[in-house]
Amino acid sequence: QNVEVEITESVFFDNQPRLLDAIRHLHQSGYRILLDDFGTGYSSMAMLKDMSFDTLKIDKSFVDNIGDERGNKIVDGIIRLAESLELSTIAEGVETREQYEYLKAHGCDVIQGYYFGRPMTAESFEMLLSSQTAGR
């Protein structure tokens, strides 16, 4: 229940029955299945119907268009679609406060990206944790 498997849409392009069966088996065994890069390439609504996903990951290419009327509508549509299918959402690549506020206000479940922090080494992460713990 604590293990998540991220699958990109391109995996479904070949529609290999053996692969699809393996994904279904993982889900039935309790693994959470996340569909990464949703809407960027090979997705189809039939795939959402036929496969058991737990989470849709909103690709950075859509997050980058937040602030544009049409971009906002697309992101909102993905969030609403996920909600209607009882899936959670993760927005990737959030870099600005505007993007964060929009996603938060429109019900995105998890928001990640450089807005919160840049990638760092394990040593830098330990130092960050130590400094935050010492300040308490």
Model-derived regions: residue spans:
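C-terminal helical cap(s) of enzyme catalytic domains, especially alpha/beta-barrels
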Residues: 70, 104, 120-136
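Short, conserved glycine- and acidic-residue-centered signature motifs
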Residues: 19, 71-75
